[in-house]
Amino acid sequence: MRGLSMLLRVLCVAALTLAFGGVAAGIMGKAEAAPYETLMVPSGAMGRDIPVAFLGGGPHAVYLLDAFNAAPDVSNWVTAGNAMGALGGKGISVVAPAGGAWSMYTNWEQDGSKQWDTFLSSELPDWLAANKGLAPGGHAAVGASQGGYAAMALAAFHPDRFGFAGSLSGFLYPSNTTTNGSILAGLQQFGGVDGNGMWGAPQLGRWKWHDPYVHAALLAQNNTRVWVWSPTNMGGDAAAMIGQAGEAMGNSRMFYQQYRSVGGHNGHFDFPAGGDNGWGSWSGQLGAMSGDIVGAIR
């Protein structure tokens, strides 16, 4: 069983470390010389086909979820995050959906075109099981920024599908009063999106239903392997972070405390002074966690 490792860093701040029915289009692409397929996976929930970069390698897969400014056709994990180079040849498959910009990869109450939780937790794994021979469950979800939130939420609420969750600069406490205001402001500023259409106005209380911090006990009870990385440096890709890197940093630390308080012991938490909230650092972290992912799901 994987234990919990601790690392204390003092570099101006203290950093704690605890050691997602149709025919696919077989378009071939390359990322760092690793060939992948672009699958068009039908989503009945969203009423359209979703482009998914797929690299076969085993029955269990890593689902890679993009930051807020996700590209419409090819995941930024493929074009900027070197996902295929980092994960190819390790005995696991790679699944990277595109088109999830400004969505938090959740089911929106007032926008039928954004039903990402249904797609990632049901439609996509079922389609991959039927068409690519993947296992129905036992996968990993890893994401940056909004994708970090979604990875943790998918693992918390769909443990039959996901046994590993990785969050890089993720918003892990969205129902926090300061955080929900920041998310709403950032969605409007960078995406022109009214975030109240997601889970309703924050004061109505439904944001808590979807919150990994509030439901951290589920991750602890299921012994889900978690990896959380968030730097103290506020620099990086502003659009990818909707200008709210500080909220992600604070959220990750509060999530760590909550996870520990409910008995969580199967996590890696790292809050370094180095790195930033952008693809150079996120790509490096994906490579760093690759062995951990393989050990958890292969």
Give the ranges of each region predicted by the language model.
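Secretory targeting and sorting signals
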Residues: 1-33
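Non-catalytic cap/lid and distal C-terminal segments of serine-dependent acyl enzymes
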Residues: 28-298
